[in-house]
Amino acid sequence: MEMESAAASTRFHQPHMERKMSAMACEIFNELRLEGKLCDVVIKVNGFEFSAHKNILCSCSSYFRALFTSGWNNTEKKVYNIPGISPDMMKLIIEYAYTRTVPITPDNVEKLLAAADQFNIMGIVRGCCEFLKSELCLDNCIGICKFTDYYYCPELRQKAYMFILHNFEEMVKVSAEFLELSVTELKDIIEKDELNVKQEDAVFEAILKWISHDPQNRKQHISILLPKVRLALMHAEYFMNNVKMNDYVKDSEECKPVIINALKAMYDLNMNGPSNSDFTNPLTRPRLPYAILFAIGGWSGGSPTNAIEAYDARADRWVNVTCEEESPRAYHGAAYLKGYVYIIGGFDSVDYFNSVKRFDPVKKTWHQVAPMHSRRCYVSVTVLGNFIYAMGGFDGYVRLNTAERYEPETNQWTLIAPMHEQRSDASATTLYGKVYICGGFNGNECLFTAEVYNTESNQWTVIAPMRSRRSGIGVIAYGEHVYAVGGFDGANRLRSAEAYSPVANTWRTIPTMFNPRSNFGIEVVDDLLFVVGGFNGFTTTFNVECYDEKTDEWYDAHDMSIYRSALSCCVVPGLANVEEYAARRDNFPGLALRDEVKYSASTSTLPV
């Protein structure tokens, strides 16, 4: 376990003392200790002596309480020899007993945690664990996780283990610790549903890298590790050329039935398509998604809806997670920031909202936060840094060019510079530290203009116009470009899409979607650009498709359960309770019911 020694140290402060004592009392006793007055104990460590007060040491450590008060010990004893600790660590522990602060650095954290554990000083243990959490990286996550085998640090262990699972692909590329895992440790990692890999090829390649580090002693372990790969989810060509024909696999008799079963499962998937029953087969069971795409609210069946569905990209399934107590909302914005989903502005067929609601996806609770300065239906929303930006929209009277941003820490909205044009039904995103907004409707015509906001200068700059007018557009940053997708040009709903290069200040067309749509949700999940629902010119739709910039092609994804437009989407990564938003991997009765309920399509005209 290595950490950058140049990293800044942290002075940990324990706000709640293990034994309550006023700050003034602590300060006075520390002055007495430093002056050598009223001390009633001497702690000896490797020839070094530390004078102290027994009651102060007892206040933070059950070890010292037992040492000074046990029946077999002489309570009048003054000098104690303490083995198994260095003088430097004992000095820090005694200082902590008096001041409740301790400097924690990459150089001392391991020894300090060991010493705090030895003396049962939970304040320092907690401080060291928090420090190690903050230092987790690709190079040290395995070492930190193993370090917790020796000490009771369950939260740190969980954090480190989930870091390994969530960052597996990148960690394998750079971590020397990965190559030193035992076969059991590696097996335990790669069999987990939580392992975050976009393709199972990455798991197989990791196994090969681990074996190649010591092939003579490790090649026989291929029979233990290969069944933990979801082989039937691989592309057939990769499986046949790279797995089935691999020398380690071919030389293992135990791998032959695994290959046969994988081929059969792959054939069944190809012929019949995936079903929930496949989730019980370890060769076809999809991993849990690292990120969940939420599709929130919208316009359905002639009225706004409160429906919320969660998309599990690894299983290609939608899960109904609607909170029935929440009121319906359409033409709103959605944003994820620092653990919360924010629902911003919108319309319920009666009122135009300036209100903002915050959803905690772990606790599943909703709270109202500060309202915007303006009512904003058809609002454009995006996140940059620590702020949520809300731009344009319609307040029930006029289309807006105003913009504002929200800071969760202060729970305040602040106006920023207005845009060059009034824009409702536009869409916004962020790329390279700037906010982009494209298209929309100004009250007279659909727009093909676009502009960019510089947060440092608080200025909007007009950029190259799009190739098509687009209101009800979807805009998203994907790779190195800003994508503008679909929308309404004043006559037709569009299938077309285009990509903007900030470097060249130019737009280029990309392949068209399968279906025309406006007022849909748009997000990027697992390096794919998803478009969700919308209005096709005749009806609302539950159709979903995705674009892969690597292949420059669109693909069909699983339909939502609910036909709707005017919805908003956002992506939530790294949820601790992701299973509650993902397709069920177990075999409980009725597990498919929550995914299969569908609502009638609306053929109503959308509100303008």
UniProtKB/Swiss-Prot annotation:
Changing A313T: In SPGF11; results in impaired self-association. It comes from Homo sapiens. The modification Phosphoserine is found at S501. This is Kelch-like protein 10. One of its GO terms (molecular function) is ubiquitin-like ligase-substrate adaptor activity. It is found in: Cytoplasm. It comes from the Eukaryota. Its main location: cytoplasm. GO terms for cellular component: Cul3-RING ubiquitin ligase complex; cytoplasm. Kelch repeats lie at residues 292-339, 340-386, 388-433, 434-480, 481-527, 529-574.
